[in-house]
From Swiss-Prot:
Intracellular or extracellular location(s): Plastid, Chloroplast stroma
Record PANTHER family: ATP-DEPENDENT CLP PROTEASE PROTEOLYTIC SUBUNIT, CHLOROPLASTIC ATP-DEPENDENT CLP PROTEASE PROTEOLYTIC SUBUNIT 1
InterPro entries the UniProt entry points to: ClpP (IPR001907), ClpP/crotonase-like_dom_sf (IPR029045), ClpP/TepA (IPR023562), ClpP_His_AS (IPR033135), ClpP_Ser_AS (IPR018215)
Species whose genome carries this gene: Physcomitrium patens
GO biological process, one term: protein quality control for misfolded or incompletely synthesized proteins
Protein name: ATP-dependent Clp protease proteolytic subunit
GO molecular function, one term: ATP-dependent peptidase activity
Keyword Hydrolase: yes
Reaction it catalyzes: Hydrolysis of proteins to small peptides in the presence of ATP and magnesium. alpha-casein is the usual test substrate. In the absence of ATP, only oligopeptides shorter than five residues are hydrolyzed (such as succinyl-Leu-Tyr-|-NHMec, and Leu-Tyr-Leu-|-Tyr-Trp, in which cleavage of the -Tyr-|-Leu- and -Tyr-|-Trp bonds also occurs)
Gene Ontology cellular-component annotations: chloroplast stroma; endopeptidase Clp complex
Subunit and interaction comment: Component of the chloroplastic Clp protease core complex.
Protein's job: Cleaves peptides in various proteins in a process that requires ATP hydrolysis. Has a chymotrypsin-like activity. Plays a major role in the degradation of misfolded proteins.
Family: Belongs to the peptidase S14 family.
Top class in the EC scheme: hydrolase
Amino acid sequence: MPIGVPKVPFRLPGEEDAVWIDVYNNRLYRERLLFLGQHVDDEIANQLIGIMMYLNGEDENKDMYLYINSPGGAVLAGISVYDAMQFVVPDVHTICMGLAASMGSFILAGGEITKRIALPHARVMIHQPASSYYDGQAGECIMEAEEVLKLRDYITRVYVQRIGKPLWVISEDMERDVFMSAQEAKTYGIVDLVAIENT
């Protein structure tokens, strides 16, 4: 959690006195607002999954809203968040604010189709998964490379399913870092709407 997380007064129905609660851990989660505002790792993935499962059990009819500003991160952690989003009964709206790169864009695309939004100045980036395994036996490096290729194929096929572009287009685009504006991400199919600025 960020340093200096604000506290807000909250009163349970039927209670006279309000208590001061952490805005992230209580108030926003009660409103079904989730935030991915950091590098995707196992810890943040487990927190998001736990919250989604809790909210799913609490009320299967109320949608969830996942706000994303993330440079990406660990592939398996990102895939686990995506899988949880597909598992829960309520629709998960995804909203890109700032940057959704790498696994951040994968999670963004995993929102309920027609309910994926980018704020007007948001940026989205897709690319292929990378391996950090360079030091080891040749056999281990080969096994690692095979696993990365399997993950790349899985991610590519999910993008094809969620975006609607041909496999060869997604596969070619994932060869390098492809940055997109909010409008370009909409045209590409990662998001369905670009939010309009309030004036």
